[in-house]
């Protein structure tokens, strides 16, 4: 006799299913430091998808050593600028920022996003942070960066997106010295990641507005007579007779999409600077042409085209990096049908 197993429809892991506060996703943790000092995060804008023909280098795979077709996502990654250094201290409620220093001569477009601090006392503030590190008051050093979408033709905006990135270094002094060296400078994608490495991606998914429970939670459609009584895509009950209120566990209609989603262990298949290598005939739908630096990531990434995608060192890396893949062909066929 078959075992009766009927899991609950949908998942409560992402509840409440409401719109994200911002189109800029957040990383709430950073992995342990490895290697030379560098930023642990980057950001780009989603272009679209295509496929590549590459040699399968997955160990013990049935197609190991054979040519396979792999779907990839193209993300255009113009250089980002380091705007500030922020020092954190731990207290009973967690970490809090205790000091920050802003660079001078930042891009004028940054005023579209925030009131830009003048940074007149940069040398004095840097000295104060150094003293606090020596006194043991600082628990972490991070960098405040922002994107430069004005250099992209596919993203119709000039307003930068500001975010915070961790710094990979063994100790605070090394972090602080590296942060001072890159303060106010441009950082490219090749300064942070290498081809073949694993990364985590975070983005805001495609917004779908208000949807019914069938699409939002994946409930079964009504069967037989029930479906002919005007309730094909509705739930059977809101709860028992004796309840004074409707439980939050009941699948109901509401906001669908525009949620933050983080995906782990995505592999970078290629980092390039010539957009013609990946731009299809007629350009990408709803984006256009890739003209600058870009990355090819294996598989899909949340969000529509032009959406900001954040990249981070893997916080749960399950395997070692496979190295640089052998890509034989990148499809440039038209995506317009």
Swiss-Prot record:
Residues 1-20 are annotated as: Disordered. Part of the 50S ribosomal subunit. Forms a cluster with proteins L14 and L24e. This is Large ribosomal subunit protein uL3. Pfam families: Ribosomal_L3 (PF00297). Signal peptide: none annotated. It comes from Methanosarcina barkeri (strain Fusaro / DSM 804). GO terms for biological process: translation. One of the primary rRNA binding proteins, it binds directly near the 3'-end of the 23S rRNA, where it nucleates assembly of the 50S subunit.
């Amino acid at each position: 006799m078959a075992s009766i197993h009927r899991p609950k429809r949908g998942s409560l892991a992402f509840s409440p299913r409401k719109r994200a506060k911002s189109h800029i996703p957040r990383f709430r943790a950073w992995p342990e430091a490895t290697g030379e000092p560098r930023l642990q995060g980057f950001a780009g804008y989603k272009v679209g998808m295509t496929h590549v023909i590459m040699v399968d280098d997955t160990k013990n795979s049935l197609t190991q050593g054979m040519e396979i077709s792999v779907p990839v996502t193209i993300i255009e990654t113009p250089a980002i600028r380091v705007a500030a250094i922020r020092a954190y201290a731990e207290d009973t409620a967690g970490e809090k920022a205790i000091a920050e220093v802003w660079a001078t001569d930042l891009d004028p477009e940054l005023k579209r996003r925030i009131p830009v601090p003048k940074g007149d006392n940069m040398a004095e503030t840097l000295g104060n942070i150094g003293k606090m590190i020596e006194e043991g008051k600082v628990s972490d050093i991070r960098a405040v960066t922002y994107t430069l979408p004005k250099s992209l033709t596919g993203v119709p905006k000039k307003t930068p997106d500001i975010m915070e990135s961790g710094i990979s270094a063994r100790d605070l002094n090394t972090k602080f010295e590296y942060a001072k060296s890159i303060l106010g400078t441009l950082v490219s994608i090749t300064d942070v990641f290498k081809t073949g490495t694993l990364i985590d991606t975070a983005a805001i998914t495609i917004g779908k507005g208000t949807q019914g429970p069938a699409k939002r939670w994946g409930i079964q459609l009504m069967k037989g007579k029930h479906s002919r009584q005007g309730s094909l895509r509705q739930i059977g009950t809101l709860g028992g007779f004796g309840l004074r209120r409707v439980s939050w566990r009941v699948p109901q209609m509401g906001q669908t999409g525009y949620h933050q989603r983080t995906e782990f262990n995505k592999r970078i298949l290629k980092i390039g600077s010539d957009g013609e290598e990946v731009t299809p005939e007629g350009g990408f739908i709803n984006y256009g042409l890739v003209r600058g630096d870009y990355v090819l990531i294996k598989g899909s990434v949340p969000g529509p085209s032009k959406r900001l995608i954040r990249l981070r060192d893997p916080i749960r890396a399950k395997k070692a990096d496979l190295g640089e893949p052998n890509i034989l062909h990148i499809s440039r066929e038209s995506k317009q049908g």
